[in-house]
């Protein structure tokens, strides 16, 4: 889901020498009520100050998204955006509540999180993953294990 903290960081980023790229994937039905205080719709996110300043991109996946659909969406939208942005560092808010077995209704597999780790590692830049979401210990263990295992 959209994070107000990410948007605040973008809004306060200096325009010189630093570019931030916030790409988030919101899982859930498009007409679902917003459950998080201060959450915004994808349409509320802007382009920022251009090449030298903050940039915000949003991408929303449907409810009950599968691994295959996630991979297809990554290939069509995320990979080209990352390639054109050429980050020097990736800080990933790794929301695990999109995994099958969690309460959100998504059907991402541990393999999906391993895929994300490999894709970001393939950029050849440092990455920092901050674990967010995910409430069932067995699901967390499988997804974190898959993500970390893909980095070795």
Name each model-derived stretch:
Residues 134-152:
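C-terminal active-site-proximal or functional interface alpha/beta core segments in diverse enzymes
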